[in-house]
Amino acid sequence: MIVNIPGERPYDVRIGSDVLDGLGNYLRRVDATANAPRILVLSDTNVAPLYLEEAKASLRAADYRVSEIVVPAGEKTKSVEVAGEIWEAMAGLKLGRDCAVVALGGGVVGDLAGFTASTFMRGITVVQAPTSLLAMVDSSVGGKTGVNLSAGKNLVGTFTQPAYVCASTKTLSTLPSREWACGCGEIAKSSVIDSDEFFFWLSDNASALASRDRDVTAEAIARSIVFKADVVAQDKTESRGVRECLNYGHTLGHAVESLAGYGTYSHGAAVAEGMRFAARLGAAIAGTSIDVVRAQDNLLDELGLPALSWSAAPEDMLAVMKRDKKARGGVVKFVLPLDIGQWELREVEDDVILEHLAAWARSK
């Protein structure tokens, strides 16, 4: 299955169980990588033992010179310090602007590889080879790259489109249950914002997706990518407000991740909690139907994303939200679902947020 991402520099997303085997041959057909003298594969300590040799063998079979960097797995790796180590390693390998970086891993590896590639020598080509469901449906497509600071997630980064995306569904067979549910959270987010058709298809197939049905999984990945590609095509750098819809659930979700400690809850679980909060906020201030709230709750439950039992002080949550990238002049903005397939970005006053955060905390 191939999804074409349109734009000034269009690229393909190839989805299938055998696409990693053909990585080298595919890259020889991509203009940006066809004549690259060297490919650097960036992976992590979870993924490298499983798939690094296969990726390298495919690249070498296509007559690429191949180098590798393996970083520790986990969100803490997505840091300026690790990025600096990668830049130094790139310099040591004498990578030129005609070389390319392949990101073989989940979202952390994809973000880190995209960021370091886009900034080293003012930009070298990056190829995404996501191995997690979350990375396939979210971070590998759209061009956002970045690293975290102590003040918050993804505060330093670039917009850099990949030259190619290789989504090997074979790699999902080794994905832990927690990470599977994490990807399901982003798929659910996309369905709520996209359309009735996507949402009700996902609702009908939620149990099959949760149990990793191969055909349903491939279809869910493709639908999510098509949705995101359409949004990104309208607003590549978040300058027109259209792309803000992709942050549905993330305002509270990022605060949960930050205050609970990165890694305590998966990104998808935190986003799902943010979706529940935003839908209830929408019902209170934007006319969102309670039927939408319930339908979303049911979908998240069926996908293995129950409401979290964790909470934090409303004032602490609000302080983190004010550092959210959507905030302007200290005013927090939420993506609110007006209905399935309809949304708005709304500024919400502090006292309203605190009131609803207090109710959220009491429910735990």
Model-found features: residue ranges?
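Glycine-rich beta-strand-to-loop/alpha-helix junction loops that act as flexible
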Residues: 73-74, 104-106, 236, 248-249
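Non-catalytic interfacial helical region
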Residues: 87-104, 113-128
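Active-site segments that bind and position negatively charged phosphate/pyrophosphate groups
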Residues: 205-315
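ATP/NTP phosphate-donor binding region
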Residues: 1-99
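Short glycine/serine/threonine-rich phosphate/pyrophosphate-binding segments
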Residues: 108-115, 136-137, 254-255
